[in-house]
Structure formats: structure tokens, C-alpha cells
Amino acid sequence: MKRTYQPNRRKRSKVHGFRARMSTKNGRKVLARRRRKGRKVLSA
């Protein structure tokens, strides 16, 4: 059986990257929440 996590750098950044987050309203909300919480890393 194929495992669910098949690492791929391009997909990772396209889906969870900073620019992907900034491109939508809700993505910006995610970043704002993570900043408020004090996360060292905001996005993949």
C-alpha cells in the first residue's frame, strides 16, 4: 500500500507556502493567527 505522505517540495510550497497563504483572504487570516500565537515559522 502506498503511504499518504509523498514528499514533494514544489507541491508543499504551492499548497502551504507563504505566497500561497498571502494569495487568499483566509490564507492571510491563517498567517495573522500564527503571528498572534507567536509561531517561529509561519508557513512551509
Swiss-Prot record:
Residues 1-44 are annotated as: Disordered. The gene is rpmH. GO terms for biological process: translation. The keyword Ribonucleoprotein applies. GO terms for cellular component: ribonucleoprotein complex; ribosome. PANTHER family: LARGE RIBOSOMAL SUBUNIT PROTEIN BL34M, MITOCHONDRIAL RIBOSOMAL PROTEIN 34 FAMILY MEMBER. This is Large ribosomal subunit protein bL34. Residues 1-19, 26-44 have a biased composition (Basic residues). The keyword Iron does not apply. InterPro entries: Ribosomal_bL34, Ribosomal_bL34_CS. GO terms for molecular function: structural constituent of ribosome. It comes from the Bacteria. Belongs to the bacterial ribosomal protein bL34 family. Keywords: Ribonucleoprotein, Ribosomal protein. It comes from Geobacillus stearothermophilus.
